[in-house]
């Protein structure tokens, strides 16, 4: 099951913008071979969609729950589904916050 390909969608709430969160996620996801994207949302949250091995996605979820220093994660909503294969790489999408 750990090698099973899956998709993780997550919304991270709290003090998560302006603290380098997106670039931490980008570096981590790229290092462990995930594809997808991360972006800031207008409501102050951070949204992430990622695909890859389930075990690596669980590692990403753990990172999302902790956040970088300077952040304060209060809640992570997440869901699992089958991988679609639609992403070629992991990227930071233009968000609605200009702080990082």
Give names to the regions the model predicted.
Residues 1-100:
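Intrinsically disordered, low-complexity, mixed-charge
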């Amino acid at each position: 099951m750990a090698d099973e390909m899956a998709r993780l969608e997550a919304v991270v709430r709290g003090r998560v913008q302006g603290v380098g969160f997106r670039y931490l996620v980008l570096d981590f996801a790229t290092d462990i071979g995930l594809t997808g994207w991360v972006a800031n949302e207008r409501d102050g949250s951070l949204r992430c969609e990622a695909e890859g091995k389930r075990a690596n996605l669980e590692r990403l979820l753990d990172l999302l729950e902790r956040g970088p220093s300077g952040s304060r994660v209060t809640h992570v909503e997440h869901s699992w589904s089958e991988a679609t294969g639609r992403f070629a790489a992991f990227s930071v999408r233009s968000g609605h916050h200009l702080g990082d």
